[in-house]
Amino acid sequence: MIAENRIEGDVLVVGGGIAGCYAAIKASEQSASVIMVDKGYVGKSGQTPYATSIMAFNPDIGHNLDDWMSYINKTSEYVNNRYWTECSIKKSWEIYQELLSWGLQFKPVDEESPEQFKYAPKGLSKPRGYAPDELATILRNKVIECGVKILDRVMVTELLKQDGRVVGAVGLSIDSDETLTFIAKATILCVGACGFKPAGYPPLVQLTCDGEAMAYRVGAEIGGKEFVDTHYTRVDIPGVVGRKSVSPELEARFGRDPGYTFFATGEKYNAEGNRIDIRPENGSEYFFTYLQLELEAYAGRTPIVWHTDRANELVGGAALGMSLRKADGLWPGNTDCASTVPGLYAAGDSLCTYQNGATYALIGSAVSGSASTGAIAGTAAAKDALGMGALVVSDDAINQVKNNVRAPIEHKNGYSPRWVTQLLQNTMMPYFISYIKKEDRLQAAATIVSFIQENLVPCLYARDPHELRHAHETKNMVLSAEMRLKSAIFRTESRGNHFREDYPRRDDANWLAWSKIKEENGNMKLTKEPIPKEWWPDLSVPYEERYPFRFPGE
């Protein structure tokens, strides 16, 4: 027997990472009744348990906003949305102080120490480090303290829409054959980044593009997905995040720290042209922000061994299906984190703010951006909801969505979601598809993904609630892959973490712009959103000075 529950509130928050927790807390502070749903466990959701620092901007201790913005604008290759970049910087100290007041302990920072400039030029603060397990506990306790109703281990699968407005969602319990209906005057998607369940990056295992897929299906605009994330992982233990313990073989050959980054053959790795110098006065520090390991694969020279005190062989492609922080997700319809569909908001990695543009511009900015947009979205959604009258959602609208949600478990036969996911991974995984891009290869992959979308996804079947969840995750990942490939084809230039072998140069005349995705008459349509001219770089400055990083083929 299928159990069905209906839960009502003013604001529904989907996702329990730092963005979702901030959204729920701030909505509650506006006296809204808040429901919070997470596929995992609120506080420990998504990538939040893996984040360990937050940037903290404070002019009172010598920070200069123009310096910070100038660095990020150039590092982002001029396609950052400067409104959201500035917002994440200015609100970072407030977020930092708030987390302190909630009991989170940060590691001490010496603002005068040269160590603080390791990841950014002088004048930019070293990010404040903390223990992620402490943050998870503090966030959850604060959400509970605010009176938010938490539902762990529930996957929201489809949004409810009535009279052009999102009015809640339908979800599935992961532990039972239970369908849940959430009625809410405003819904905030905080479901994190996208991924295709890669083996090499555990933070993505539950982040399967659910938010943007649901939003796309109700008509929301989605940000382009061409700027890929380039996290790497260890060869010997792909599922480990970070570089822990040197292998005995490498230690015997090279010692624990040979003092440089090198190939597994022992040849020294020359990073020239594949880095941004961040301490030009010394020339001793640099921050990799591009496709370094993918470009080495392209040249046939992987794996490399990272220069650390615990060297390991590394390969790229760990975060398959993921974009840069804040470089995909729902397109913001305004500065309140609303989407382009009434009643629907987003925050964190689910909101395409482009605060970092085409690269990950500054360590610690991800947490600041997630917390600040969560706070903005929560406040705005609560005010929106409290300004409405009574909300009545028709049974017909609910039942239609429920039938779609349960369709795979009603199928008597079809395709296993695990098998379809493996097909998708095999299609998208090669470095020469997702990272080193060229139109003929992208079109070939897009043809396969379109076939999967049209012929296999409608026939996904599930034998139990666990497999039903997998079916919805697979459907969402396939849709995201189609968006990713079409975005890569659409941007006919190279910039930041988007490298087109057939267009290896930046094209400022045509591509100082963002791409957007929307469903129109059953088709996926991509459009350009021009970047305001006042945010453009000075085009009179020589190309080589505007863009210090060189792509192969330039």
Identify the function of each model-found stretch.
Residues 11-36:
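N-terminal Rossmann-like FAD-binding beta1-loop-alpha1 element of flavoenzymes
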Residues 186-240, 360-380:
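Glycine-rich loop(s) and the adjacent beta-strand/alpha-helix scaffold that form part
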Residues 29-49:
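Glycine-rich FAD pyrophosphate-binding loop
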Residues 56-88:
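Glycine-rich active-site loop/strand segments that organize a redox cofactor
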Residues 93, 100-157, 224-361, 429-554:
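Mobile, glycine/GP-rich and aromatic-enriched active-site lid/loop segments adjacent to catalytic centers
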Residues 160-181, 187:
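Conserved beta-strand-loop-beta-strand element in the redox core of flavoprotein oxidoreductases
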Residues 384-466:
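Long, amphipathic alpha-helical stalk/connector segments used for oligomerization, subunit docking
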Residues 6-9, 176-186, 340-341:
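Core beta-strand elements of the Rossmann-like FAD/NAD(P) dinucleotide-binding domain
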